[in-house]
From Swiss-Prot:
It comes from Escherichia coli O139:H28 (strain E24377A / ETEC). It comes from the Bacteria. Belongs to the CbrA family. This is Protein CbrA. One of its GO terms (molecular function) is FAD binding.
Amino acid sequence: MEHFDVAIIGLGPAGSALARKLAGKMQVIALDKKHQCGTEGFSKPCGGLLAPDAQRSFIRDGLTLPVDVIANPQIFSVKTVDVAASLTRNYQRSYININRHAFDLWMKSLIPTSVEVYHDSLCRKIWREDDKWHVIFRADGWEQHITARYLVGADGANSMVRRHLYPDHQIRKYVAIQQWFAEKHPVPFYSCIFDNAITDCYSWSISKDGYFIFGGAYPMKDGQTRFTTLKEKMSAFQFQFGKAVKSEKCTVLFPSRWQDFVCGKDNAFLIGEAAGFISASSLEGISYALDSADILRSVLLKQPEKLNTAYWRATRKLRLKLFGKIVKSRCLTAPALRKWIMRSGMAHIPQLKD
């Protein structure tokens, strides 16, 4: 049975960043359900926008995005729609439009060969015994059993590691549904849509490489029905759909209280969305994935006396920032307040008409 310093479950942005930063400093194994390359297998349903905070993380790491990760076009504003109030406003935003699956594979490709990476793998079981974490996973057609001193859950909204550490922990979840259509709009755009009759979260659209992506986060019980109803409503706002080319769905976390942020225990750690580190106001998680990976890297390499306590303390600023997003979300999803803000014209950039 092979033993490692660190076992990382999941290689999204958080897991890939951590594996890269620990390479050569600790003995690391990393498991991921995505393939190493290509479009087959699992891909994360996501609008694919890189926020300024995520861009800053790449600046700190001295990384630049390859052209095959960047999508077309680059859009500098968000069209914000309040369906019930029939209001539309344009707000400046500095996102980078990316191909999310290509981005995830690129992040994995940066992991040095000193890290033992298993692609297209499935973690079957984890448990703690004799001060070690045991992991059973399936890869390359057979089951393997390894042990590790530290276990890292970077496995997203449905984190197996989080459920093992906190079996009674409850956090609000939504089903994120996206459909891809051939682009029909004369001018590509990115939108953020609020309709409290459909969801107390929000919906979105983005133009990307000749496609129009429409999606949103909806209650788990009847999400598909709500998604279809909203699509019908959006014709009044000149949204054009046609026949769906592709449909996607996944679970997304929606933190709504301080206790929703959990960092781990017993030499197991949670990073990224597995820890609840996702913005409640925008559902943006890449920047917090990168930041939490960097924080954990620092803790693991410094080796303080109580690592879990040190990681909890080190993420306090990040958790406070995310709690602020919870407050912001409550403001944005409050119909009267949102209507007042949009009607005020604050920060709105009117589009010139011919």
